[in-house]
Swiss-Prot record:
This is Polymerase acidic protein. One of its GO terms (biological process) is symbiont-mediated suppression of host mRNA transcription via inhibition of RNA polymerase II activity. The lineage of its organism: Viruses, Riboviria, Orthornavirae, Negarnaviricota, Polyploviricotina. The keyword Zinc does not apply. It is found in: Host cytoplasm; Host nucleus. A motif (Nuclear localization signal 2 (NLS2)) lies at residues 184-247. It comes from Influenza A virus (strain A/Goose/Guangdong/1/1996 H5N1 genotype Gs/Gd). One of its GO terms (molecular function) is RNA binding.
Length: 716
């Protein structure tokens, strides 16, 4: 049978069928009848779609070989044969564009003329039997069903056969030929008997033993068993008066629904206290790069070689001294650590062959900075379980901090354009279907808007640092490895450029669990004088390490160069997410895409080109105390990207809590704006849940202040 399938069907169909079977863990060499059935079904779907187009007047037309320049659109979108993720993407896109109800199961085709999804069936049994099985499985009146059999019979929903006689005859003839070919090889009987009915997943699976007891224990009050709870839930009518439903749920609940009016919400209370401080793993707007253009030195691409080459571009090194000490740290150790880096880099250069990695000597200053031997000794629980006053450390609650202006400046800077490109346009191959062409066009427009954005630089920097640190943590667990902080970009003229921001030194890293911490010391170049905002840099010890000549309109000026040094830590799971910062553009691209989809459905055509090329139109970007801020579509793309990047850079439990809880209040306010007359109960409890996340995190405090601006303008 396998040989027959490979001879009988087009190689592309065979390849798609193999892929589909592998996706479900099935082997085409073993389940040969299933292999043949999938190939047959795919071929019928393709034949159904072949030669059917919609012309410029919106009429359905059949063209077998005509003018390639005619403005024709394929009448059918083929969904069958794509991998599941792509297939659902196509289905979602069609539903968003056309407003058709989303099907529960993946259909096979979409008919742009009749505006409906089609489920194609090919059966070796009675068409009526198979039709009923399909209809029972799909349970949707919106999806059109069309069944063919190998005996030339067919059946379709409401006897509406969609295609003309001739097109259907072609399909029936092909099925009859396949049957004859199989019969002549003695394969038909086995194939005919192997067809199973439509398989539907049984939704109720039995819970037994411990899980059953746990389920019975974890029910809401007044329910004695899971079965009774299930019966109650199945019979629960969701529409109707909320208060009645609540009282029906439990004797404990007596919620009073209060109307939510324009005057109801109050602003969020932001904490008082000293201004919040910088807590990102690396400097953002204040970072300074030492760069080389068109790098072609020996060992180019090896981080240590690149770093040494970048260091040689700067000639203003001076004897370092401390200009802003760290409040709690032993500051001379930070100074000695930098001197040690300079000395050991010098040692490398004196060697004949520069090594690929550099492990620092374990000096007392580095041991102190990396917390070596500082962890309390671990004792086996068996040895101390009898200690009467055994308890956990008392940990101090975080002290509240107030919102500082620097975090808004930091965000504004992330939305700006730089003079370099930080991402290349992907080479993804030719587009085949119309939907792929639209997707590529959107991606290219979006990439053009964000490739020069500073937030994109932060993505590449974050990915590089986290990847290098995770690699070193696994490969050199006991070593204090020196890791250069590097990024690569292209100048306006298209020349390659390698940048050095500074160095990290990794501490001991025996990371068994995802949350085990590896300490590191970061040393980063900057031209920002820390004394202007000392509260912002409280976790840093800042050294002055030299003077840099800068070209300005008035000629060359000399500016002091600083080194921001701090002890920091991260974990395997944080590094894993840091390495995946390239996902940020996807999130913002999806948000832009939903804006385009909304516009397209109003205009009933794809608006991608107009959306990006109409430079005169402005779009809402966000709220500020001044009102709704507006900007070009490029600015919207960059702002959305910067938000996504900052969510990654400043990820924290406070942000998780604030995002989840404030969203509830946001939805209530949106309902009020849409005149849906929302009602609430325990609004005070919701405010409490939001405000307990407003402690000291700069990004959360900024988001809360934006939320307050939104409340003010939304409820005018």
């Amino acid at each position: 049978m396998e040989d027959f399938v490979r001879q009988c069907f087009n190689p592309m169909i065979v390849e798609l069928a193999e892929k589909a079977m592998k996706e479900y863990g099935e082997d085409p060499k073993i389940e040969t009848n299933k292999f043949a059935a999938i190939c047959t079904h795919l071929e019928v779907c393709f034949m159904y779609s072949d030669f059917h187009f919609i012309d410029e007047r919106g009429e359905s037309t059949i063209i077998e070989s005509g003018d390639p320049n005619a403005l024709l659109k394929h009448r059918f979108e083929i969904i069958e044969g794509r991998d599941r993720t792509m297939a659902w993407t196509v289905v979602n896109s069609i539903c968003n564009t056309t407003g058709v109800e989303k099907p529960k199961f993946l259909p096979d085709l979409y008919d742009y003329k009749e505006n409906r999804f089609i489920e194609i069936g090919v059966t070796r049994r009675e068409v009526h039997t198979y039709y009923l099985e399909k209809a029972n499985k799909i349970k949707s009146e919106k999806t059109h069903i069309h069944i063919f059999s190998f005996t030339g019979e067919e059946m379709a929903t409401k006897a509406d056969y969609t295609l003309d006689e001739e097109s259907r005859a072609r399909i029936k003839t092909r099925l009859f030929t396949i049957r004859q070919e199989m019969a002549s090889r003695g394969l038909w009987d086995s194939f005919r008997q192997s067809e199973r009915g439509e398989e539907t997943v049984e939704e109720r699976f039995e819970i037994t033993g411990t899980m059953c007891r746990l389920a019975d224990q974890s029910l809401p009050p007044n329910f004695s068993s899971l079965e009774k709870f299930r019966a109650y839930v199945d019979g629960f009518e969701p529409n109707g008066c909320i208060e009645g439903k609540l009282s029906q749920m439990s004797k404990e609940v007596n919620a009073r629904i209060e109307p939510f009016l324009k005057t109801t919400p109050r602003p969020l209370r932001l904490p008082d206290g000293p201004p919040c401080s910088q807590r990102s793993k690396f400097l953002l707007m204040d970072a300074l790069k030492l760069s080389i253009e068109d790098p072609s030195h020996e060992g180019e691409g090896i981080p240590l070689y690149d770093a040494i080459k970048c260091m040689k571009t700067f000639f203003g090194w001076k004897e370092p001294n401390i200009v802003k000490p760290h409040e709690k740290g032993i500051n001379p150790n930070y100074l000695l650590a930098w001197k040690q880096v300079l000395a050991e880099l010098q040692d490398i250069e004196n060697e004949e062959k520069i090594p690929k990695t550099k492990n620092m000597r374990k000096t007392s200053q580095l041991k102190w900075a990396l917390g070596e031997n500082m962890a309390p000794e671990k004792v086996d629980f068996e040895d101390c379980k009898d200690v009467s006053d055994l308890r956990q450390y008392d940990s101090d609650e975080p002290k509240p901090r107030s919102l500082a202006s620097w975090i808004q400046s930091e965000f504004n800077k992330a939305c700006e354009l730089t003079d370099s490109s930080w991402i290349e346009l992907d080479e993804i191959g030719e587009d085949v279907a119309p939907i792929e062409h639209i997707a590529s066009m959107r991606r290219n427009y979006f990439t053009a808007e964000v490739s020069h954005c500073r937030a994109t630089e932060y993505i590449m920097k974050g990915v590089y640092i986290n990847t290098a640190l995770l690699n070193a943590s696994c490969a050199a667990m006991d070593d204090f490895q020196l890791i250069p902080m590097i990024s690569k970009c292209r100048t306006k003229e298209g020349r390659r450029k390698t940048n050095l921001y500074g160095f990290l030194i990794k501490g001991r890293s025996h990371l068994r669990n995802d949350t085990d911490v590896v300490n590191f010391v970061s040393m980063e170049f900057s031209l920002t004088d820390p004394r202007l905002e000392p509260h912002r840099w409280e976790k840093y010890c800042v050294l002055r390490i030299g003077d840099m000549l800068l070209r300005t309109e008035i000629g060359q000026v000399s500016r002091p160069m600083f080194l921001y040094v701090r002890t920091n830590g991260t974990s395997k799971i944080k590094m894993k997410w840091g390495m995946e910062m390239r996902r940020c553009p996807f999130q913002s691209l999806q948000q832009i895409e939903s804006m385009i989809e909304a516009e397209s459905s109003v205009k009933e055509k794809d608006m991608t080109k107009e959306f990006f090329e109409n430079k005169s139109e402005t779009w809402p970007i966000g709220e500020s105390p001044k009102g709704v801020e507006e900007g070009s579509i490029g600015k919207v793309c960059r702002t959305l990207l910067a938000k996504s990047v900052f969510n990654s850079l400043y990820a924290s439990p406070q942000l998780e809590g604030f995002s989840a809880e404030s969203r509830k209040l946001l939805l209530i306010v949106q309902a009020l704006r849409d005149n849906l007359e929302p009602g609430t109960f325990d609004l005070g409890g919701l405010y409490e849940a939001i405000e307990e996340c407003l402690i000291n995190d700069p990004w959360v405090l900024l988001n809360a202040s934006w939320f307050n601006s939104f409340l003010t303008h939304a409820l005018r």
